[in-house]
Amino acid sequence: MSLSTLKNRRERGFFDGQFLIAMPGIEDRNFARTVIYICAHSDAGAMGFVINRPQSLTFTDVLLHLDMIKQEDQIVLPQRARDFPIQTGGPVESGRGFVLHSDDYSSDSSIPVSDDICLTATLDIVRAISKGDGPTRATMLLGYSSWGAGQLENEVVNNGWLTCPANEELIFDRSLDDKYERALAGMGVTAAMLSAEAGHA
């Protein structure tokens, strides 16, 4: 599923607003030990963002790359902008930035993905954040994760993923190191329990 499909969707799918939590059997380095927030799911496929993978780029790097600021301007950026988190959202269009954010910011290009969360993938939100005028809660993700028709359903049936309702606090939490464990804890399980279960499968 692509961003254009997300824009044009009419109905919410079964996995919309869910977390996917990778089972130990997933060895693909793009998805091992990941937590993915599913933004859209339909008969055409699914789209979401990994929310626990750091990115080496900083928000200042992004602004410099986009020629929004000059090297000497970075010292006058609001502290909130300098600290703004950048993460790796997935392997598809990995050079493109997407901002998941609270619904207190909206532009013509913002797409609601839940009652409280929107997705914006245009420069207007980057400018707003750089000036300290952006949404209260947000994170920028480079790239996204995508599944074709029936692919995600098949992976879930084959025990590739655990699923549970998404938690907004976890989506925007900047502490990434233990986010996988905390997502599992929200379901009452641990990584050790999953590994033991996989060993007996």
From Swiss-Prot:
Parts of the chain that traverse the membrane: none
Organism per entry: Rhizobium leguminosarum bv. trifolii (strain WSM2304)
One Pfam family linked to the record: DUF179
Family note: Belongs to the UPF0301 (AlgH) family.
Protein name (Swiss-Prot/TrEMBL): UPF0301 protein Rleg2_0617
Cellular component, GO annotation: cytosol
Stretches assigned to coiled coil: none
Family matches, as SUPFAM superfamilies: VC0467-like
PANTHER family found in the cross-reference section: UNCHARACTERIZED PROTEIN YQGE, UPF0301 PROTEIN YQGE
